């Protein structure tokens, strides 16, 4: 039976930590664990998900919940309430619903103070890891039978009815993910016509019906070249010499978005080496199964620009293809032959590996994310199959694996700190401080221990890194990568908790550590007044013309984001209240410029585009909160009035809100097709309206929405998993499994605190 271990570093000498593994979460299979009843519960959950996989495509993350609720002997002792038509919403009913939610949410907390949860959804994450382990000869040791079974379960659970796989679990089938998952099944032991419900045959038919494997997008071409199914001539050039360019150039790596930089860094190494794994009998079979003509007869260079229409979200501009062709025809032949292969190529490869090792060491071999992690593992193995770097990478693989009722997947990377910072604020909003004191104490300790205390090592600027001292990451301290909104939300938590008695919530954070957090937020503000996510946004935006990834957008350079800007405003306004003299003028200027940015980013319909949540509902909640925190009101700010109008006009018949993930991709508001609202998005809208003072004008829309949330609460005190509500790079959706617990609780808390405590009963 699968068990989640918290804060466990294991006994591998190749793993190390900066904070004793606080926040680390790793799954382990124990054949002797679990009673027959517990195993039956898990099997029932698996079967239920599979039977309903086309109705609700995101899992409910039940295996961890089963485990922790059992360990803590959880039983919901507070009876539920339901609000009937025309019945009044009383403070008592809301308080009961809140206490049920808090009781359940508190039980889900781990011993080190965070809330473990799934953070996944893309379907191109896991197959490359399987490919990497196959190529390096470590497939059997890393993925024994029970692991393979769960990986395959996940693949089967998320195969679309047409036989393909989407970019994410709710997406339409695309060539990239269908090819990757087909090959993954074959490597894991399924025959050409094997797999559950003819999974392999159906997938192969989809591939051939949509232009064949040569129409896979660029990342697919790279991985198939590594495997030996394609020739490297099918890939556009990724010369490692790029990393030797002078820093004054506009297209220097230092000016790239960190994720783009750290994906193409190991890719350029593999390309520069033209690395190909062992050509095994299976690889030869895959060539026959996927290609429509013999491998030797394929004109590989003509496939470079092929891409299935289903994959094509960001078509390459003509200028980009011209550059690829120029590099392919004129530059690469020079760099791969004497004397340039000795003078430049070998030196460039060494430079790239220097950067890879630096990034690995500064993230404790977690790396910035799962896509980069797998590529860096392979690059380290290619450089030295017996080297320490490869061994250290393997030791950190468990940090990415997650098991749910739909099988085993890879996290983007954990959301430990992000989730904890939101939950703390939700619990504080309940005003049930005596009920949640011990929970807040542990969470407070986790947040304090998770702050990054140092900048990256050595001359970090020469390695294209920004300061990180005082920041918080998305996951845990060991990860090391500063994130602006995670820093702002965690700083806000520390400030809020410092205002409560230490005997209830623990000792407050030292002021110097708070100052460090303020420093990093101030350092990140861009020219437009907004905040990027990771590093200063210094590059020109037209560099996006060179985005080589067909299925993502705004991936080349760092941008300024509404959500990050709002979080920073809220944190710095509170900081200014508690520490009014620290960098006073700079903080005031920051807030003023950030407000102007939020007003500038508002769309014509009054909404704000959300970059990290779906979509205009999410962005509008953040923007309204930021503007109000800065002192703006409905009466004195046209942006708030327009934002409120947008939310009111998108409220649905059942009282809630429901926005499709297509809003993110199409960049226009698209409602959910089904009539039922999304509880998480409803919660965002409620909080946005409350902060904008809707209760003072007409509270009826709020009452209708809260009634929906109360009536949707489940027996144990949580809410059901519905559609995905996270997103990145415009087109790829992400599941935050804790959102269904966090935001309804938070919205009810704000409603009770700001409305009902002043009005004993409300008729709707």
Swiss-Prot record:
GO biological process: what's one of them? Answer: pentacyclic triterpenoid biosynthetic process
Q: Indicate whether Repeat appears among the record's keywords.
A: yes
Q: What class of enzyme is it?
A: isomerase
SUPFAM superfamilies from the UniProt entry: Terpenoid cyclases/Protein prenyltransferases (SSF48239)
Which controlled-vocabulary keywords does the entry list? Isomerase, Repeat
Question: Active site annotated at which positions?
Answer: 485 (proton donor)
User: Which EC number(s) does the record attach to this protein?
Assistant: 5.4.99.39, 5.4.99.40
The cross-references to InterPro entries, in alphabetical order and at most eight, read:
SQ_cyclase_C, SQ_cyclase_N, Squalene_cyclase, Terpene_synthase_CS, Terpenoid_cyclase/PrenylTrfase
CDD domains according to UniProt: SQCY_1
Give me the Gene Ontology terms describing cellular component: lipid droplet
Annotated TM spans:
none
Could you name the domain of life of the organism this protein comes from? Answer: Eukaryota
List, alphabetically, the Pfam families matched. Answer: SQHop_cyclase_C (PF13243), SQHop_cyclase_N (PF13249)
Known catalysed reaction(s)?
(S)-2,3-epoxysqualene = beta-amyrin; (S)-2,3-epoxysqualene = alpha-amyrin
Q: Which GO terms describe its molecular function?
A: alpha-amyrin synthase activity; beta-amyrin synthase activity
Q: Which family does it belong to?
A: Belongs to the terpene cyclase/mutase family.
Provide the function of this protein: Multifunctional oxidosqualene cyclase producing alpha- and beta-amyrin and several other minor triterpenes.
Q: How is this protein named in the record?
A: Mixed-amyrin synthase
Q: Which gene encodes it?
A: OSCPSM
